[in-house]
């Protein structure tokens, strides 16, 4: 991937997230409920819950909302019937797409996901058809101007697996997804606050899209992300703004 688009894509992602904060809160509440139901309500001993709570804080969700979601999850009320289902498929020019959902009605969800794929030029794949093209990792992105040497030393000491600098000067740190919270805490303790910090499915190879193909691909991704049951959408497509 060209370095010039890395930072631009992250900033675009953050702006888009801010624009639909209400929807993000709804998704986070579902994730918090499920995490608490499966692993208990103590974030210090439940990595999945800790990650969801951290995301909620980053999204400026009130703490009372977070606490209520945890209590509902532990109590087995709302969220008790949510099922995690992953769908895989292809976008424009065969770009790989992973769609993670939390649903209480898998028939409804698969129909909506399939419809979005077919309506906007993609198609559903089978289980495992594209997941092998991605790595499950913790990812941090730091703004251009961050001290590369100091960050690299802190990151490697914290247990990160890889530190790389993009052409635009932004710095990316990768770690095992299970070590995400520990690495995040260590980096912040060392004075490094990431612009983006998440557990993600990172594509092993990325494909840039421009012009009409970029517009078509963005419409497909937006259609998938706007579905109520969808939690995350991952792709190896990079939309280059011209």
UniProtKB/Swiss-Prot annotation:
Main localization, broad class: cytoplasm
GO MF terms held by the record: DNA binding
Gene3D superfamilies in alphabetical order: 1.10.10.200, 3.30.70.980
Record InterPro entries: Integrase-like_N, TACO1_YebC-like_2nd/3rd_dom, TACO1_YebC_N, Transcrip_reg_TACO1-like, Transcrip_reg_TACO1-like_dom3, YebC-like
Any one of the GO CC terms: cytosol
Keywords, alphabetical: Cytoplasm, DNA-binding, Transcription, Transcription regulation
Localization per record: Cytoplasm
Family: Belongs to the TACO1 family.
Protein name: Probable transcriptional regulatory protein Bcep1808_2379
